[in-house]
Amino acid sequence: MTDAKVFDELWQVICERAASESLEKSYVRHLLFHEKGIDKSLEKVGEEAVEFILAAKNGVSEKTVGEAADLIFHMMVALKAADVDFDLVEEELAVRRAGMHLHD
């Protein structure tokens, strides 16, 4: 199993690419600064969500894993576009996880 810090590292890369004007060909910057605004990032989330659903429904595990990774990445970019820090998502998940223990 991979250490959960991979999400923190990915978030850091997304933030760095968003802040750097020197990375004009950055895919992250393309999504964040597209003429459609946040809609571009959200379109990609929708597209990747559908691809994930289809892969999971069809039972192709390798494809499902790849599409899940794509979906998570694009959701993180959309969070950046919405000016929502990923730490807040992690905190929310931790709160929900702690709440689950209360009902066990």
Swiss-Prot record:
Annotated metabolic or biological route of this protein: Amino-acid biosynthesis; L-histidine biosynthesis; L-histidine from 5-phospho-alpha-D-ribose 1-diphosphate: step 2/9
GO CC field: cytoplasm
CDD domains (UniProt xref): NTP-PPase_HisIE_like (cd11534)
GO biological process: L-histidine biosynthetic process
Keyword tRNA processing in annotation: no
GO MF annotation, one: ATP binding
Name of the molecule in the record: Phosphoribosyl-ATP pyrophosphatase
E.C. number(s) listed in UniProt: 3.6.1.31
Pfam family membership, one: PRA-PH
Family, similarity comment: Belongs to the PRA-PH family.
NCBIfam families: histidine_hisI
InterPro entries in UniProt: HisE (IPR008179), PRib-ATP_PPHydrolase-like (IPR021130)
Keywords from the UniProt entry: Amino-acid biosynthesis, ATP-binding, Cytoplasm, Histidine biosynthesis, Hydrolase, Nucleotide-binding
Predominant place of localization: cytoplasm
Catalytic activity of the protein: 1-(5-phospho-beta-D-ribosyl)-ATP + H2O = 1-(5-phospho-beta-D-ribosyl)-5'-AMP + diphosphate + H(+)
Database matches in SUPFAM superfamilies: all-alpha NTP pyrophosphatases
UniProt subcellular location: Cytoplasm
